Structure formats: C-alpha cells, structure tokens
Amino acid sequence: MSSRLEREAARRRTFAIISHPDAGKTTLTEKLLLFGGAIQMAGSVKARKAARHATSDWMAMERERGISVTTSVMQFPYRDRVVNLLDTPGHQDFSEDTYRVLTAVDSALVVIDAAKGVEAQTRKLMDVCRMRATPVMTFVNKMDREALHPLDVMADIEQHLQIECAPMTWPIGMGSSFKGTYDLLHKQLHLFSATHGGRIQSGIVIHGADDPQLDEYLGDQAEQLRMDLALLEEAGTPFDEERYLKGELTPVFFGSAINNFGVREMLDMFVEFAPGPQPRPAATRVVEPGEEAFTGVVFKIQANMDKAHRDRMAFLRICSGTFTRGMRLKHHRTGKDVTVANATIFMAQDRTGVEEAFPGDIIGIPNHGTIKIGDTFTESKEVLKFVGIPNFAPEHFRRVRLKNPLKAKQLQKGLEQLAEEGAVQLFRPLVNNDYILGAVGVLQFDVIVARLADEYGVDAVYEGVSTHTARWVYCEDKKIFADFQDYHRGELAVDAEGALAYLAPNPWRLESAMERYPKVEFRTTREIS
C-alpha cells in the first residue's frame, strides 16, 4: 500500500444523513457545507440571504441540466479531512434508493426534531444501520423552539431506535429560554445568540459545574444545569469510542441548525471519531481499502429525467485503490473491459470531472443502461463480486394494466428495465400473467406510469391488488419446499431476477404460513445478485 493511498484513504469520512421530513435535514446539510465548503473556499461566511440566493441559482442550473444529482452526493473539505455526505431523500421521493445509500457509507448522522422525537421513517432507516452495525451520531435539532425535555428525547431514541445515548452537549433551556449548550467533553459553555446570525460565540471555558462564572452567564438557569449535570454524572452513559464504532451507542448533540448553533461541535467530533473507509465483504473474500488495485461497487442509479438523453448516472463507491481518469476497468457482471473517461465527482457547489479519487469517495459514471445496482468494477482480472446491497421487501403493491394490448412487449421491456434500475420491484405470479409492482413508497407507482409513457410509449394504469406484504422464501429441505409451493401456489411469484417470493394477502396469512412451515425461511431482504 502506497503511503499516499494510505494517507488519502485515512482522510475520508463518508456518511449519510438520516431524518424524517421536516426535522431540519436540508438546513443542517447546508450548514455543514457552509462550515466545510463556503468558509474554506470564500474565507468568510456570506450573508445568509446571499448564500441562499447562490444556492437557488445553483439548483436552477441543475434543473436545466435535467438531473439533480447534487442533492445526492456532496464532497467538502473540513479540518484536513475530505467529507463525503450522502443525502437520503425525503418522503416525496422515498424509495429503495434511500435504503441503498446506507450500504455505501461508513457511518450515519440521525437528525431528530426536538419537539417530535423519533418518527416512523427514521426508525426504518435505523433498522438498516443496525443490520449493518453502522456507527451513528445524533443531532437533536430545533432547540430554539419549544421542545421535549432532553431526557425524554434520549429515552425516545433508546426505545425506538434501540441504541444507547451518550450526550456530548447538554441544552440549557429551550424555546424562548434557550441559553445555549454545555459541552460535556471539554467542559465548555457555548452561549446561544440569535443575533449575529446565530453564530457561535467562542466556547467559554468553565472549570467544572462549581465555577462561579456559570451563575454570571446563566443566572437562574445555572442551578438547573448543575442538577442536570449531576444526574448525567450519576445515571448518564459516558461516550465510549469502541461502542460507538460497533453501532451500540450514539453520541447525542443538541442545537439549532438554522442558527448554525451546535453544528460545529458535532462536525468537529464527527471528523475526529467517525470511521474512515471500512473493509468491504465480497463473495470470496474481504477487500481492504488500502489494497493497491482499484475496486468499486455501484449502489445507486439515477435516471436522467431529460427525455432527449436516455443516459443514467451510476453512483459508484470506491472500496480500494486509486481511481484515475481514463483507467480501464473490468465490469464483472458483463465480463467486459471498459474505459472510464468521463467520471464525475460531486463537490459542494459543482460537479467536476474526476482526475483521481480514493477509497470512500463516490464517483458518477455515465451509464447507457448497461450498469446495474450491485455491479462490481475492478482494475485487476480477479473475479470479484461485492455483497451486501439488498432488495428490501416492498410495503405497497399495485397491478399494472395495459390500455393497448398491442404494447405488451414494450410494457415488459419497460418494467424490466425500470426494475433493474431499482426504482421498483417487479413480481410475476406463478398462476397468471399479471405484472405486480412492489415499492417502498407509493409515489414510485406514479413515477413508473409516467416513465412508461415518456420513455417507452406505453399507456398504462395501475390498480389495487390483494397483496399486503412480500417475503422471499427459501428452504434447504426440497420435499418441504415443494409441499409449501403446492399449498401456496396461488400466492407465489418470481421477482425480476427469478427469486421466489411469497405475496401474503394479509398479516394473518403470513403468520399462518410461517407456523405451518417452520423450516421455510421468510426473508425481508434479498441480496442483489
């Protein structure tokens, strides 16, 4: 391993932001870019109005290009680290993509609205983090508004996200009486000031809770803070780096993203403690980030919504080695060698051609329909297939009906290609010729119907279907499996890759099937082959 590769890989921090819509994720993302991008590049913080104007111009330009990849991946420098931030879309475009983003990162940041606590979408995404033992940090946002008590917020996180909380900062008051936060690690007081654009005044060093300066700055609230600190000292969970890296414990920060408050402490701790690029399991072995030979895996495909250009962008996570412009790579699923001349890297404020990139970086490769999610690219001829990019059991189902029967072939082609892209899952029942679509979010069905019309000239509609949930089924005992398939034939289907799935009409039917056939596995995820 070259010392440069080792050095560059060690600088990378690749993470995703997880939150429920309206918890302030977009605002926090902008503030992270402000601390990491604008401050580094401009040397000063622009007025917020001007910054907002610049951002909106930038987005308009993106719209003209017809593809909004900038919201998906952003890279920015911070304190000699290179941070790759992956956005998980909000509920409007919630899809399996959101889950798969979490397979491309080494850690995650959960944003929680202090007034609402943990919400449904956050739970689903945390399930994926838990499955992969992903280290998670938590930012409790909107402390400048009326909120739940911080102990209640942490209890909510521990109960619903099944992870222990270690507070790193502690809020002093909330809403109109919000005075700031106390940094438990460095024993510093950060005073909140909604004036000056809410920028942090330098931390005031306090020598423990008995320091008389505490009363000077906080007045009546000093005593409450002392009581809180005594309680945390006695009953709180201290930060443990090892447990954080195992995904067992989350450091918790309190603040107000819109006022830039509490963001810097979290970002400082993030670049210090979050893991760099991690080893990646392949079917035959584990690939270490420091290996000289380049390897990468595609975790997302974004369609170009510009109808004039059918191109798609494949998002590839670099797992090892150095990527350089124009290098020849082996595309393992097709067995072909390809030259990657015009890959893209996504900087905080623009997209640029990649000259070189390192483990942990995300690059975009133009794709004319030949690249699929889960595809592996390598520099060497070694046969390699990265694992761990799953399909998730859909939660919503619709049947697709064709208005013009003569377009059956185009419908099949369109649905197969869209399923390949990961936009939706396609199931073909064993007992009829229906096309059943399964999706994580209902909006995906509208997207599919619109794209069938636009891109494939197919006029189709979708309608309800009596499927409640899907499970991929597997059994080592062939006799039991054959009996199961005979008994449930009317509820079985194959997906786009030929895997057998049980489409349960209701929860009771699924429960009954699982009780009747205990040796059959009913899986909620399936590895993409």
UniProtKB/Swiss-Prot annotation:
InterPro entries: EF-G-like_DII, EFG_III/V, G_TR_CS, P-loop_NTPase, PrfC, RF3_C, RF3_dom_3_sf, RF3_GTP-bd. It holds the Pfam family GTP_EFTU. It is found in: Cytoplasm. GO terms for molecular function: GTP binding; GTPase activity; translation release factor activity, codon nonspecific; translation release factor activity, codon specific. It comes from the Bacteria. GTP binds at residues 19-26, 87-91, 141-144. Gene3D superfamilies: P-loop containing nucleotide triphosphate hydrolases, Peptide chain release factor 3, domain III, Translation factors. Keywords: Cytoplasm, GTP-binding, Nucleotide-binding, Protein biosynthesis. GO terms for cellular component: cytosol. Residues 10-278 form the tr-type G domain. The keyword Ion transport does not apply. GO terms for biological process: regulation of translational termination. NCBIfam families: prfC, PRK00741.1, small_GTP. Belongs to the TRAFAC class translation factor GTPase superfamily. Classic translation factor GTPase family. PrfC subfamily. Increases the formation of ribosomal termination complexes and stimulates activities of RF-1 and RF-2. It binds guanine nucleotides and has strong preference for UGA stop codons. It may interact directly with the ribosome. The stimulation of RF-1 and RF-2 is significantly reduced by GTP and GDP, but not by GMP. This is Peptide chain release factor 3.
